Amino acid sequence: MSNIIIREAIPGDLNALLECEQGIVRYERPFDGTLRDGEIHYYNLAEMIVADHVHVVVAEVDGKIVGSGYARIEKANPYHKHEDYAYLGCMYVEPEMRGKGINSLVLEALKNWCRSKNITELRLEVYTYNEPAIKAYEKAGFKPILTWMRMGLDE
C-alpha cells in the first residue's frame, strides 16, 4: 500500500468529506431506528472546514481521500474540572481500507492539534452495539463513562 497522508481538510475536500459522512450514516443506520430515511447530514462540514475552533483532517492514499475525522473545541459544563474539551466526530475510514492503521493516524493528528490548543480532554459518541468502533477507541485509550438511553413512546 502507498503512504497514508493525514492532512488538514480544505474547502476543495468537501465532496469527499460528504461521502465520508454518508458512509458513517449508512454504517450507523442499523444501530439507530430513529434516523430519518433518505440522505441526512450529521455535520455542517463546509462551516467546520474553515472554523477556527474545529480541526478537520482527511486521510489520503494515492491522492484519494479514504478517511476523515474532526476535533471541535467545546465549552465544558461548569462542574467539570476542565474548562474546554474537544469533541471528536466524522471518524470514518472506507471499508476496504480498515485495519491498516488509518483511524489511529487520524486520531493522532487530532490529538496533536488538541495539545497545541491546550486541550486535555477528548470526548466522542459511539453507538452501544458498534463493537468494532468501541474496541478501536478503547485501544486508543478512550474509556466509556456514560450510557445514553432512549424510549420511543409511540413504538
Model feature map: region roles:
Residues 25-45:
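Conserved GNAT-fold acetyl-CoA-binding loop/helix
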Residues 58, 64-73, 87, 92:
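Conserved beta-strand in the GNAT
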